[in-house]
A protein has these predicted regions:
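RNA pseudouridine synthases
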Residues: 1-192, 267-268
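Accessory RNA 3′-end/elbow-binding domains used by RNA modification enzymes
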Residues: 1-10, 14-41, 71, 168-293
Length: 293
């Protein structure tokens, strides 16, 4: 079983627990997730099954964004008006320094920060640079809350943005709820619940609901190998870049998805005058005849 499941993670469950659930359900050992969601958060959690796990590094780059919708709740004598919050949010857009919450899923010495915090340990998350594309504030709620949609890059912590928004407006704030609506090409409207996935598995139809290996990497350039290079492709031999249309025009080191007769064969990168394989993933019908680099 190879491909992606777009799972709707429920709140109160870790991303690792979702992976364990899918692993037990399918009997497939090679299962992972692409983009951690904190336990309290809900929303899109792409699950990689089988050979799809080898594509993790190509799924999301700096130009891809994820939509996150959350609420903040602020307390204090001088509650900021809506326009003040909108103005403050402008300072949190672009490349910003961020210190994730100690209740995040970031691991320190192999243990998630939220576990260390709950165990009473004195922990502090490292500062990192993240990219925030946009922050859109929607309506206020009667209980001093505000709903907002954030488009951001990989590794951004929405809880920290809520904290920072409170600091900028001079009024303590915290995140009340987070729903990730999109991660790369994986969207909320196409996500399935864990119960739905289990039902498909029980019916023997889960395989038909798997997204193909190249589903999450459509943002990467494509290279089509001619049929006469089939032997080199099957053997994982580097390919002459000038024989693949458009490859020589790509920047040095650019990763591309390689196709042969419109079938996805894996990822390679331009190195000088050659296209060098980084991840050979032959179609299942060809797998026994291919040598993996």
């Amino acid at each position: 079983m190879n491909g992606f499941l777009n799972i709707l993670k429920p709140p109160g469950m870790t991303s690792a627990a979702v992976v364990g659930y899918v692993r037990r359900m399918t009997g497939e050992k090679r299962v992972g997730h692409a983009g951690t969601l904190d336990p309290e958060a809900a929303g899109v959690l792409p699950i990689m099954i089988g050979r799809a796990a080898r594509l993790f590094d190509y799924l999301v780059d700096k130009e891809n964004t994820q939509d996150a919708t959350g609420k903040i709740s602020a307390t204090g004598e001088n509650y900021p008006d809506f326009s003040a919050m909108q103005e403050a949010a402008k300072h949190l857009v672009g490349d910003i320094e961020q210190r994730p919450s100690i209740f995040s899923a970031i691991k320190q010495d192999g243990k998630p920060l939220y576990e260390r915090a709950r165990d009473g340990e004195n922990v502090e998350a490292p500062v990192r640079i993240v990219h925030v594309e946009s922050i859109e504030l929607h309506e206020e709620t009667p209980d001093h809350g505000v709903r907002m949609t954030i488009r951001c890059g990989r590794g951004t912590y929405i809880r920290s943005i809520c904290d920072d928004l409170g600091k900028l407006t001079g009024c303590p704030a915290h995140m009340r709820f987070l729903l990730r609506a999109q991660s790369g090409v994986f969207t909320l409207d196409s996500a399935m619940t864990m119960e739905e996935a289990a039902a498909y598995q029980a019916q023997g139809t889960l395989q038909t609901h798997l997204l193909p290996l190249d589903y999450g990497i459509q943002h990467m350039p494509r290279a089509d190998a001619p049929e006469w290079l089939r032997k080199q492709v099957c053997n994982g031999v580097k390919l002459p870049a000038k024989k693949l249309p458009g490859v020589l025009a790509l920047p040095e080191g650019q990763a591309v998805r390689v196709y042969l007769r419109d079938e996805f064969w894996g990822m390679a990168a331009r190195e000088g005058e050659f296209l060098v394989w980084k991840c050979l993933l032959p179609p299942e019908k060809e797998e026994n005849n291919a040598n993996h680099p």
